[in-house]
């Protein structure tokens, strides 16, 4: 009897689904996308035959050249916007084996179920699978489920659907738009600004947000202000701290020490009389169940997870069947989910924690209500009971579990008190709050202490308080806060830029391109990021407009719902975009994109005597001779490195940013904070932070010490030279002063051990591609990974039996592993694991994918079984 074939996109998901389907189904994974538009540099078809231009005039030759360049561009992009958006999809490298297996299984199957994820990306994967496998469309059915549970899968297979081509076309539209912008604008940036630059339809808009915030911070001028607090005692000698809030009926707002001291002098001799004590009930409602953006934000603030890590862990939890689908913008909960939560609350917390009716939360206008919020698949699966999940995945599940319960619990109830005291013309206040009923905070306590969470001492109206001390405090206004990953996601969501499925990719891409970087989990715009943003803003105003980008997301939603035609929208976009691109490609004098400008200075070139200019490259700011613009034979290539005078503003913590801004010189032309660099022992240059848009700079002469390197030093394991601490786009690392060797800085601040050359095992083939395994030794011990990483990212633990078989290939430091037992007492294969706590490798085993309790340690030169 033939079986039905079920195709999903991940092995973990296939493993979970397989537990719930009967023997009449064969469940296989496509391991993500199986085909895509061509990668850069891939060859597609035969090369076009050259066209002879002999005898043609200049206009005809230019026309032939333009046609040739256009055809080459279309070939690289893999889509042809000039001919009805014809796409050249190709099987992804390394996926040939997967495709061959799926085709073979499909031939034998009586029906094929495409069970990829329920979002547009999942719909597109399903469509690509159907297109590649081929055959009658009637053989294919689409099944979707919001959670990988027995009941959800049963319902999905009872009511299979057809592929939704509107959703597929929405995904293709997004892909084509991004492809066009990236492939057609990036070469322009290479030509006009600097080689190696790139642009993205949504990513460039996200960078714009960060650049604007960077400039707000640099332009910000801190202003002084003072606060005055008064420490008093009531008649029972209980301490009460009062803040001065008003003076003569207006807000108390001293701008300097003189104004503050005037108040202090009066308050030191004044009487303090209680004039009012108001107590009223207040409450704190629970937040809605998680959607993608709020999960990312809360995981960042409560757990310290980055957006990418949060989504990776959520994906694993979903594929293991523990939570519902993690890419959603809907706060909707099914009736079954509500019943599950309410039953659990009543049984485990009591009736007082159960509202009369379920709590409902509104979703944003374009949210897909068919989707649910992120919640546990089964509330009875407690965090500590999860099997096969790493520690951080369990922590994330615990957060989701608690938020789901909290959202269906009553508000926390407080008694909030405000004490008002007068001292002459001054009004002082103290606030307190007492928790009367914890409500939802029973399962999800609020983080951070509220300064009002105190019980005010007992006082009566007209009571006089005894003065203990008057405390004036100087403050300075703070610049706008820098974006964290979580805050940036919140801002993107608020502006309607991107969707739940794209936030993580946007955050990752803008960091990888080098236009921004993160330090202490906060974003800093690099100078090149500012320049590229300016050029794109000037030449592609509509593309960089926040509202236009948000409206395009709405258009994609309309395509997905079948309201508008996808190619009509693509054609309209391309028409407008092509017009802007043509203008941008012109010379600057004709209205084209401005080149990467320089700022000429009075500093003379030490080689030719011409003026030096402030230039910006991807690596930073430097001085370059203006003679570089001359013809090759006369060209002067002299450059001078600029050494930052001290730690730059962008490596300081947020609390220090105000002081740093105050200490920096201000540009006399635009008022922006200046960056200071040492040129040599006798000169320093202060450059406007808004360079090159502002040509302000200042030369300071004197005697300056060029600070040498005084950081940590380790010996290079390749050449023996010193390795120094450096800062790159992905954070701190150790770099050799002599060769190109680098070493990571671990999360605990230690320098990672030297990188060992991988040991190749061509005999050990990967399961997911045609690659073979190599043995790598990293910061977390040894492991097997594909030899062509990162093209193939397949990894697995090292088996002792393999090390024994190929002992002669092992480096001396790893030879001891080959002496470990090859199997446990139950004949399960022994594998190598690494203990982060003890920082050493040990041997254990697995049975049916789960770790056994058998552990062997290497102690005193021999392998010893650990006592249970």
Curated annotation (Swiss-Prot):
Residue numbers spanned by region Interaction with DNA: 198-203
Annotated site location: Interaction with DNA: 33, 174-175, 178, 190, 327, 513
Cofactor (UniProt): Mg(2+)
GO terms for MF: DNA binding; DNA topoisomerase type I (single strand cut, ATP-independent) activity; zinc ion binding
Sequence positions that bind Mg(2+): 9, 117
Assigned EC number: 5.6.2.1
SMART domains from the UniProt entry: TOP1Ac, TOP1Bc, TOPRIM
Active-site residues, as the UniProt record annotates them: 325 (o-(5'-phospho-dna)-tyrosine intermediate)
GO terms (BP aspect): DNA topological change
Reaction(s) catalysed by this chain's protein: ATP-independent breakage of single-stranded DNA, followed by passage and rejoining
Cellular component terms (Gene Ontology): chromosome
Superkingdom classification of source: Bacteria
Domain Topo IA-type catalytic, residue spans: 164-581
InterPro entries noted in UniProt: TOP1_Znf (IPR049330), Topo_IA (IPR000380), Topo_IA_2 (IPR003601), Topo_IA_AS (IPR023406), Topo_IA_cen (IPR013497), Topo_IA_cen_sub1 (IPR013824), Topo_IA_cen_sub2 (IPR013825), Topo_IA_cen_sub3 (IPR013826)
Swiss-Prot/TrEMBL keywords: DNA-binding, Isomerase, Magnesium, Metal-binding, Repeat, Topoisomerase, Zinc, Zinc-finger
Family membership: Belongs to the type IA topoisomerase family.
Quaternary structure and interacting proteins, as annotated: Monomer.
NCBIfam families with a match to the protein in the record: topA_bact (TIGR01051)
Protein name, UniProt field: DNA topoisomerase 1
């Amino acid at each position: 009897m033939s079986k039905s074939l079920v195709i999903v996109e991940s092995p973990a998901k296939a493993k979970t689904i397989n537990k719930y389907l009967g023997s009449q189904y064969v469940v296989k994974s496509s391991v993500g996308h199986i085909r895509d538009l061509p990668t850069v540099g891939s060859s597609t078809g035969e090369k076009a035959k050259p066209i002879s231009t002999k005898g043609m005039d200049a206009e005809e030759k230019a026309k032939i050249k333009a046609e040739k360049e256009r055809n080459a561009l279309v070939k690289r992009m893999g889509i042809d916007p000039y001919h009805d958006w014809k796409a050249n999809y190709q099987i992804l490298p390394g996926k040939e084996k997967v495709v061959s297996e799926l085709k073979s299984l499909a031939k034998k199957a009586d029906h094929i179920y495409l069970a990829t994820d329920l979002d547009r990306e999942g719909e597109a994967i399903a469509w690509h699978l159907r297109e590649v496998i081929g055959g009658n469309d009637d053989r294919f059915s689409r099944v979707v489920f919001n959670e990988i549970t027995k009941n959800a899968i049963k319902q999905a297979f009872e009511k299979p659907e057809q592929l939704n081509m509107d959703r597929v076309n929405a995904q293709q539209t997004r892909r084509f738009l991004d492809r066009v912008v990236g492939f057609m604008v990036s070469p322009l940036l290479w030509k006009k600004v600097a080689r190696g630059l790139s642009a993205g339809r949504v990513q460039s808009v996200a960078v714009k947000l960060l650049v604007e915030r960077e400039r707000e911070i640099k332009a910000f001028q801190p202003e002084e202000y003072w606060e005055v607090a008064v420490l008093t005692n009531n008649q029972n000698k209980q301490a009460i701290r009062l803040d001065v809030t008003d003076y003569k009926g207006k807000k108390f707002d001293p701008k300097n020490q003189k104004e503050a001291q005037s108040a202090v002098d009066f308050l030191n001799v004044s009487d303090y009389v209680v004039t009012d004590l108001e107590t009223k009930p207040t409450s704190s409602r629970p937040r809605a169940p998680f959607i993608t953006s709020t999960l990312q934000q809360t995981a960042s603030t409560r757990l310290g997870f980055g957006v990418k890590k949060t989504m990776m862990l959520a994906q694993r939890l979903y594929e293991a069947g523990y939570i519902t689908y993690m890419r959603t913008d809907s706060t909707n909960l099914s009736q079954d989910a509500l019943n599950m939560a309410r039953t659990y609350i009543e049984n485990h917390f009591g009736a007082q924690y159960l509202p009369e009716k379920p709590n409902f939360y509104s979703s944003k206008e374009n949210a897909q209500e068919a989707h649910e919020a992120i919640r546990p698949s089964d509330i009875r699966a407690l965090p500590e009971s999860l099997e096969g999940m790493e520690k951080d995945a369990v922590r994330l599940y615990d957060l989701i579990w608690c938020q789901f319960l909290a959202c269906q619990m009553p508000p926390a109830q407080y008694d909030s008190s405000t004490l008002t005291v007068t001292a002459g013309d001054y009004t002082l206040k103290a606030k307190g709050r007492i928790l009367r009923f914890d409500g939802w905070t029973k399962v999800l306590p609020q983080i951070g202490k509220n300064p009002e969470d105190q019980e005010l001492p007992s006082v009566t109206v007209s009571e006089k308080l005894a003065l203990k001390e008057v405390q004036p405090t100087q403050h300075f206004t703070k610049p706008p806060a820098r974006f964290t990953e979580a805050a940036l996601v919140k801002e993107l969501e608020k502006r309607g830029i991107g969707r739940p499925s794209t936030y993580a990719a946007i955050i990752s891409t803008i960091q990888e391109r080098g236009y921004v970087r993160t330090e202490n989990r906060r974003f800093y715009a690099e100078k090149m990021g500012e320049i590229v943003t300016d050029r794109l803003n000037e030449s592609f105003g509509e593309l960089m407009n926040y509202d236009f980008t948000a409206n395009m997301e709405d258009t994609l939603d309309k395509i997905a719902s079948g309201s508008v035609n996808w190619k009509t929208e693509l054609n309209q976009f391309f028409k407008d975009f092509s017009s802007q691109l043509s203008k941008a490609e012109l010379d600057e004098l004709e209205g084209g994109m401005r080149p990467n400008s320089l700022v000429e200075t009075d500093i003379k070139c030490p080689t030719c005597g011409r003026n030096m200019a402030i230039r910006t490259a991807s690596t930073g700011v430097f001085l370059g001779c203006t003679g570089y613009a001359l013809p090759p034979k006369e060209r002067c290539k002299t450059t001078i490195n600029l050494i930052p005078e001290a730690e730059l503003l962008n490596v300081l913590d947020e609390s220090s940013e105000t002081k740093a801004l105050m200490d920096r010189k201000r540009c006399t032309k635009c008022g922006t904070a200046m960056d200071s660099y040492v040129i040599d022992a006798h000169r320093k240059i202060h450059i406007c932070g808004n360079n090159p848009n502002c040509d302000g700079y200042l030369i300071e002469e004197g005697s300056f010490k060029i600070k040498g390197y005084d950081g940590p030093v380790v010996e290079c394991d390749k050449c023996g030279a010193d390795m120094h601490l450096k800062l790159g786009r992905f954070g701190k690392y150790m770099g050799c002063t002599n060769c190109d060797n680098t070493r990571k800085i671990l999360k605990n601040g230690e320098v990672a051990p030297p990188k060992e050359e991988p040991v190749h095992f061509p005999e050990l083939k990967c399961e997911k591609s045609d690659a073979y395994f190599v043995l790598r030794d990293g910061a977390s011990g040894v492991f097997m990974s594909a030899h062509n990483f990162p093209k193939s990212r397949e990894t697995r633990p090292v088996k002792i039996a393999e090390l024994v078989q190929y002992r002669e290939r092992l480096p001396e430091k790893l030879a001891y592993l080959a002496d470990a037992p090859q199997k446990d007492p139950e004949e399960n294969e022994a594998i190598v694991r690494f203990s982060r706590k003890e920082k050493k490798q040990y041997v254990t085993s697995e049975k049916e994918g789960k770790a056994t309790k058998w552990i062997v340690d290497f102690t005193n030169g021999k392998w010893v079984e650990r006592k249970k």
